[in-house]
Design a protein with these regions (language model features):
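Generic detector of bulky aromatic hydrophobic side chains
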Residues: 7-8, 17, 26, 60, ...
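Low-complexity, glycine/serine/proline-rich disordered segments
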Residues: 1-23
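Short, solvent-exposed linear motifs at loop/edge-of-secondary-structure regions
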Residues: 22-41
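Functional cores of ribonucleases/endoribonucleases
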Residues: 35-118
Length: 118
């Protein structure tokens, strides 16, 4: 059997994976995928139905305009530093054209991420 993949949860590790592959690591599920496994945010935790997985890949509206906008750019979000229990306030936001940002305070402030070592 293949060795169990280590879940990628740290903000810089998630960002580096996105920079390298253009997508989230395999340990992320969209909200819809998690719901299909039995997740209900009012009744249980993601870790109850999908241990080792985090929520990520859903569209982020950027309605407040706090992230850079460009024609055709789409934004997506992913939980950061999630291991179990309730989802925290940390998120990674990544764009369809290669930008990555981190928020530690649930979309109040954002820090642009860069590949490790750059």
């Amino acid at each position: 059997a293949a060795p169990k993949q280590t879940a990628i949860t740290a903000p810089q590790d998630i960002a580096d994976y996105i920079f390298a592959h253009g997508t989230l690591p395999d340990n992320f599920l969209t909200k819809s995928e998690a719901r299909q496994l039995g997740w209900d945010s009012s009744q249980n935790y993601v870790s109850d139905v999908a241990p080792g997985y985090s929520i990520g890949g859903d569209k982020f509206g950027n309605y407040e305009g706090l992230l850079p906008d460009a024609s055709g750019r789409k934004w997506y979000e992913a939980d950061a530093n999630y291991t179990a229990g309730p989802r925290g306030a940390e998120r990674i936001l990544y764009s369809s054209d290669g930008l990555v940002y981190y928020t530690s305070d649930h979309y109040q402030t954002f820090t642009e991420m860069h590949p490790s070592g750059k």
